[in-house]
């Protein structure tokens, strides 16, 4: 009889005890948001000294910090990339090509119908006559290496026309307008003596 009384007491106590609360779930950690791509850098006016944040003489690391690495990492930028290479920075506008020689920025080119203009307001697609009018007697025309007229090179150097057949002064700065077989600007190169190259790094 005593056992029955004890069992009844235990059951009554259990019924009066509050039910155990369910464990509180840990707050969910929000998924990390994908890092948005860096915006393109404003590069809208090309001069003989550079464009936007790019200045002739910058190191390759400085160029990459300013406008990003190459858009095409698997492409070879030149036959000897250790001494000279060209690449299209991923945050630069389409058609902007930079040349790195001996680890430093030596030339900036506009190709592939880039919409960037020079400080004279000239760009790809302009006629040779428009370029010559813009510079007057400060620019010099020379035959194109691979194409017949009207293809030619129109070269302008800061400080006036140069008399030497090939400018080697590392401090020289200029712009070359490469005129194609239709008589229009097909490419523009700005920078130091390397603006005279006709085949990439050569």
Spans of features found by a protein language model:
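Sec-dependent bacterial lipoprotein signal peptides
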Residues: 1-14
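Bacterial signal peptide processing site
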Residues: 16-19
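N-terminal low-complexity, Pro/Thr/Ser-rich intrinsically disordered segments
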Residues: 26-61, 65, 202
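Acidic/histidine-rich, surface-exposed loop or edge segments in extracytoplasmic proteins
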Residues: 40-49, 106-116
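A cross-family detector of function-defining hotspots
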Residues: 60-101, 128-182, 192-198
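Glycine-rich loop/hinge motif
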Residues: 120
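Structured C-terminal subdomain patch of bacterial secreted/periplasmic proteins
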Residues: 186-189
